[in-house]
C-alpha cells in the first residue's frame, strides 16, 4: 500500500483518484502532479514503482496539504474570530458565513431543529 503525505492511498484506484484521498488535493491538482511526475493518470496505485511514488512525493511537497493545510485553515478562522469580524462572528455562532439565507434552510450549519416551546393557555 502506497503511503504519501502520511496517508495510505487506496491501491485499487487510479493514481489521479487515489491522490484525492490527501486533504488539499482535488482532481485538478492530482492530475497536474501526475503529469509533472511523468506518471500516467490511469495507472493503478498498486502498479506504481518506487521511483514514480518518490517523484509524486517530490511534486506534492510543493503544495500545502494535510496537517499543515488544516492548521492554516483553523488559524485563519481563529484570526477572524479574534478580530471580531462579521465572518468571525458567523463562524463562532455556527451560522452560514457567506451570506446565505437563514430564516429557512441553513440546516447543515445550524444542526437539527430544536422544538419550539409551545405556549398553551
Swiss-Prot record:
GO: which molecular function terms?
rRNA binding; structural constituent of ribosome; tRNA binding
Q: Where is this region: Disordered?
A: 91-121
Kindly list the cysteine pairs connected by disulfide bridges.
Answer: none
Query: What's a single GO CC term here?
Result: small ribosomal subunit
Keywords attached to this Swiss-Prot or TrEMBL record, sorted alphabetically, are: Ribonucleoprotein, Ribosomal protein, RNA-binding, rRNA-binding, tRNA-binding
One GO BP annotation is: translation
Under the heading InterPro entries, the entry gives:
Rbsml_uS13_C (IPR027437), Ribosomal_uS13 (IPR001892), Ribosomal_uS13-like_H2TH (IPR010979), Ribosomal_uS13_bac-type (IPR019980), Ribosomal_uS13_CS (IPR018269)
State if Endoplasmic reticulum is listed as a keyword: no
Task: Give any Pfam family that matches.
Answer: Ribosomal_S13
Give the superkingdom in one word: Bacteria
**Ribosomal protein is among the record's keywords:** yes
The protein's matches in NCBIfam families, at most eight in alphabetical order, are given as: uS13_bact
Q: Which family does it belong to?
A: Belongs to the universal ribosomal protein uS13 family.
Job of this protein:
Located at the top of the head of the 30S subunit, it contacts several helices of the 16S rRNA. In the 70S ribosome it contacts the 23S rRNA (bridge B1a) and protein L5 of the 50S subunit (bridge B1b), connecting the 2 subunits; these bridges are implicated in subunit movement. Contacts the tRNAs in the A and P-sites.
Q: Which HAMAP family match?
A: Ribosomal_uS13
What assembly does the database describe for this protein? Part of the 30S ribosomal subunit. Forms a loose heterodimer with protein S19. Forms two bridges to the 50S subunit in the 70S ribosome.
Q: Can you say what this protein is called? A: Small ribosomal subunit protein uS13
This protein's species is: Bordetella avium (strain 197N)
Amino acid at each position: 500500500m502506497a503511503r504519501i503525505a502520511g496517508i495510505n492511498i487506496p491501491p485499487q484506484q487510479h493514481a489521479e483518484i487515489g491522490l484525492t484521498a490527501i486533504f488539499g488535493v482535488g482532481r485538478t491538482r492530482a492530475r497536474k502532479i501526475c503529469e509533472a511526475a511523468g506518471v500516467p493518470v490511469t495507472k493503478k496505485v498498486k502498479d506504481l514503482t518506487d521511483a514514480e511514488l518518490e517523484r509524486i512525493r517530490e511534486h506534492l511537497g510543493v503544495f500545502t496539504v494535510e496537517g499543515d493545510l488544516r492548521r492554516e485553515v483553523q488559524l485563519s478562522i481563529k484570526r477572524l474570530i479574534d478580530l471580531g469580524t462579521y465572518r468571525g462572528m458567523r463562524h463562532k455562532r455556527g451560522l452560514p458565513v457567506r451570506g446565505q439565507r437563514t430564516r429557512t434552510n441553513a440546516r447543515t450549519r445550524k444542526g437539527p431543529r430544536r422544538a419550539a416551546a409551545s405556549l398553551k393557555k
